[in-house]
A protein has these predicted regions:
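Well-ordered alpha/beta subsegment
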Residues: 85-90, 95-102
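Non-catalytic, conserved peripheral segments adjacent to functional cores
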Residues: 1-88, 105-108, 112, 117-127, ...
């Protein structure tokens, strides 16, 4: 998948004197049915999460608290997305190399996924990722 298919999506934000409320709905705010959710927290300083690509899984990543950067790579181009608001999320289609870095203290990342966990969907080696996706996406 090429980076132009990535989308930073603003979620609804309802505010009143009691605080704020945001939400997401499948096929309305994100373009897939949610099959799995997980969250990342207590990441030690300097650690990297991710470092993989998916053959089929799509994700929507939100910073519920704190901040972190999502580095995306389509095998030719790279782009960094900084997430630091709980009412913005990043849609990441399948076929992109993904890393999450620069976690602030007490950050909390929520990830919704389009597939159930399947280890065979993961690509952990960057060169394998490039050989699978670069030719298909960029004709390289």
């Amino acid at each position: 998948m090429i980076l132009s298919n990535v989308k930073l999506i603003e979620l609804p934000k309802i505010s009143d004197k009691r605080g704020n409320l945001s939400f997401l709905e499948e096929f309305i705010h994100i373009p897939f049915k949610i099959k799995r959710s997980y969250w990342i927290y207590d990441v030690p300083g300097g650690e990297i999460r991710g470092g993989n690509a998916y053959k089929a899984n799509e994700e929507f990543i939100i910073s519920l608290s704190g901040s972190f950067d999502v580095l995306l790579d389509d095998g030719v181009n790279k782009q960094v997305f900084s997430l630091n608001r709980s009412y913005y999320g990043l849609y990441v289609p399948a076929g992109l190399w993904r890393q999450m870095v620069n976690f602030s203290t007490n950050s909390l990342a929520l990830v919704t996924a389009s597939t159930l966990y399947d280890k065979t969907d993961y690509i952990f080696e960057y060169e394998e990722f490039k050989s699978l996706f670069c030719k298909k996406q960029h004709g390289i």
